[in-house]
């Protein structure tokens, strides 16, 4: 019988990161809403249960609670943030609003020699106590322990930052071990699933491919599927996976919306149509997209328009395929969670995505999203397992709305043409510039692109005054795209990119570099 971990989702923005960390530990896990039935939990038969964080307060009326059967199964349970608070409240402890909230980095002291934290530390203090650098995000705190529990972590702001009932193997932490900012978070989760729950390392990507292929075949049957192919990593891997499952039942639709990267249409048709043998229909809808975007400044409105146009094009192409019943998309989990599209519908909305927002009620095709619960690094790993070329799989992500969300405000063909050229120069220089170990800066960064700013600045070229547009460069380093650090590119590289853009792209006379992290900023500007 396969060992597996059940994650109950209370609506945190970070919930799927828990699943990602468990999968990295080669343990199978599934994420389900907090309100699943007791019968489901018993049938699932987990080796352990993790309660996620969430935006609610346990002392308010009608807030989520873990099914009571979770605490009656006799298996280990780990509560994280809100998961700790609901565990405490449900088992007889107390939770109150914190006078001092904690958001961001914090240092906690491990204590009590718990099975969860023993030997896990970043450093120690003068007394020899283990200290951990962690990521906090809470406005409430546990103020009284349930019977049988002891404190296993604390700091001055949160005296009960961790608790444990060793006899029942119930553990909880107020911080978020699933985010990369908690340096020992992976070690903590590995300790829980391997040592405390007793799971072995039996789950891997080849197994996932086999499972996903079988699931697609069962879901689709003999129907035909159309997929919106952008040439980006997500849609490319989705196409390869679906093609592996159903072959020529898949038809890819490549839509040129006028918002693509330089020479992208030609590259996509060459790669998929000729090299991979996938059926691809090329639709040039650039005039329609740009026309509908004329005069629209609001980023959410732009995303909705772009999403609507994509769906309309797919519907038109589907009408030419009488057996087409499914619209496939390369939606991945960060798309879903940033649109509050998680299963609980509790996560706070940050921005909508064309894959998960903007789909009209009149859509006559069923949605097939085989990558919906995978993170970007898992999608890349899946692509390699499917035999896709390395350069394709490790290409930087490109948003579904394309340059439409990299042009601030109104989208015009002139702006798109300028941005295309600037972005191409930036990526070209990142690819050709190597560090001391011979690795390109393109490979060292997770995502890099240019952003068009619809403002003009004064400049001088030769003996003449210029009054032209501004471009911002954005490059980040991340493992999961839920949090990210700005990339510390060499000054000489930035200088060369700036010089080339200003000299080669007529209409741009100033280049700036974005040094914002995520959070507080998102990776894309819109």
Swiss-Prot record:
InterPro entries: Class_I_gatase-like, GATASE, GMP_synth_C, GMP_synth_GATase, GMP_synthase, GMPS_ATP_PPase_dom, NAD/GMP_synthase, Rossmann-like_a/b/a_fold. It comes from the Bacteria. Gene3D superfamilies: 3.30.300.10, 3.40.50.880, HUPs (3.40.50.620). Residues 4-202 form the Glutamine amidotransferase type-1 domain. ATP binds at residues 230-236. SUPFAM superfamilies: Adenine nucleotide alpha hydrolases-like (SSF52402), Class I glutamine amidotransferase-like (SSF52317), GMP synthetase C-terminal dimerisation domain (SSF54810). It catalyses: XMP + L-glutamine + ATP + H2O = GMP + L-glutamate + AMP + diphosphate + 2 H(+). One of its GO terms (molecular function) is ATP binding. Coiled coil: none annotated. Residues 203-395 form the GMPS ATP-PPase domain. Its EC number is 6.3.5.2. It is an enzyme of class 6 (ligase). GO terms for cellular component: cytosol. The active site is at 81 (nucleophile), 176, 178. The keyword Ligase applies. Pathway: Purine metabolism; GMP biosynthesis; GMP from XMP (L-Gln route): step 1/1. Keywords: ATP-binding, Glutamine amidotransferase, GMP biosynthesis, Ligase, Nucleotide-binding, Purine biosynthesis. PROSITE patterns: GATASE_TYPE_1, GMPS_ATP_PPASE. Catalyzes the synthesis of GMP from XMP. Homodimer. This is GMP synthase [glutamine-hydrolyzing]. It comes from Methylobacillus flagellatus (strain ATCC 51484 / DSM 6875 / VKM B-1610 / KT).
């Amino acid at each position: 019988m396969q060992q597996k971990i059940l994650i109950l989702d209370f609506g945190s923005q970070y919930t799927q990161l828990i699943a990602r960390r468990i999968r990295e530990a080669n343990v199978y896990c599934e994420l389900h809403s907090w309100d699943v039935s007791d019968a489901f939990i018993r049938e699932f038969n987990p080796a352990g249960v993790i309660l996620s964080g969430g935006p609610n307060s346990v002392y308010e009326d009608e807030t989520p609670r873990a099914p009571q059967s979770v605490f009656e199964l006799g298996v280990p349970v780990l509560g994280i943030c809100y998961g700790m608070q609901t565990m405490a409240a449900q088992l007889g402890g107390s939770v109150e609003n914190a006078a001092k909230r904690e958001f961001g980095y914090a240092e906690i002291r491990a204590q009590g020699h718990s099975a969860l934290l023993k030997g896990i530390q970043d450093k120690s203090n003068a007394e020899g106590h283990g200290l951990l650098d962690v990521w906090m995000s809470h406005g409430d705190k546990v103020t009284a322990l349930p019977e049988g529990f002891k404190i296993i972590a604390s700091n001055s702001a949160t005296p009960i930052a961790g608790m444990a009932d060793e006899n029942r193997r119930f553990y909880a932490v107020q911080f978020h071990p699933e985010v990369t900012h908690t340096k020992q978070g992976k070690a903590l989760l590995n300790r829980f699933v391997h040592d405390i729950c007793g799971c072995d390392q039996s789950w891997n990507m080849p197994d996932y491919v086999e499972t996903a292929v079988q699931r697609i075949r069962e879901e689709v049957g003999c129907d035909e599927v159309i997929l919106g192919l952008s040439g980006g990593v997500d849609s490319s891997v989705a196409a390869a996976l679906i093609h592996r499952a159903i072959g020529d039942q898949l038809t890819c639709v490549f839509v040129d919306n006028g918002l693509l990267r330089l020479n992208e249409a030609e590259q996509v048709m060459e790669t998929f149509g000729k090299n991979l043998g996938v059926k691809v229909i090329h639709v040039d809808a650039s005039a329609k997209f740009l026309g509908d975007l004329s005069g629209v400044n609001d980023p959410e409105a732009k995303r909705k328009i772009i999403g609507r146009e994509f769906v309309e094009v797919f519907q038109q192409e589907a009408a030419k395929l009488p057996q087409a019943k499914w619209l496939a998309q390369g939606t991945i989990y960060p798309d879903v969670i940033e649109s509050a599209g998680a299963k609980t519908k509790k996560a706070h909305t940050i921005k909508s995505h064309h894959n998960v927002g903007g789909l009209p009620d009149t859509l006559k095709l069923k949605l097939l999203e085989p990558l919906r619960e995978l993170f970007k690094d898992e999608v890349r790993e899946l692509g390699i397992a499917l035999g896709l070329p390395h350069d394709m799989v490790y290409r930087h992500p490109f948003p579904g709305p394309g340059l439409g969300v990299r042009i601030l405000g109104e989208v015009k063909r002139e702006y798109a043409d300028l941005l295309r050229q600037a972005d191409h120069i930036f990526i070209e220089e990142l690819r050709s510039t190597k560090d001391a170990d011979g690795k390109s800066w393109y490979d060292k960064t997770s995502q890099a692109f240019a952003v068009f700013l619809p403002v003009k600045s004064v400049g001088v070229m030769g003996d003449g005054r210029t009054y032209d547009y501004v471009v911002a460069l954005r490059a980040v380093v991340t493992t999961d795209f839920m949090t990210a650090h700005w990339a510390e590119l060499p000054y000489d590289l930035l200088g060369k990119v700036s010089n080339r853009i200003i000299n080669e792209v007529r209409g741009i006379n100033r280049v700036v570099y974005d040094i914002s992290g995520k959070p507080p900023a998102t990776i894309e500007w819109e």
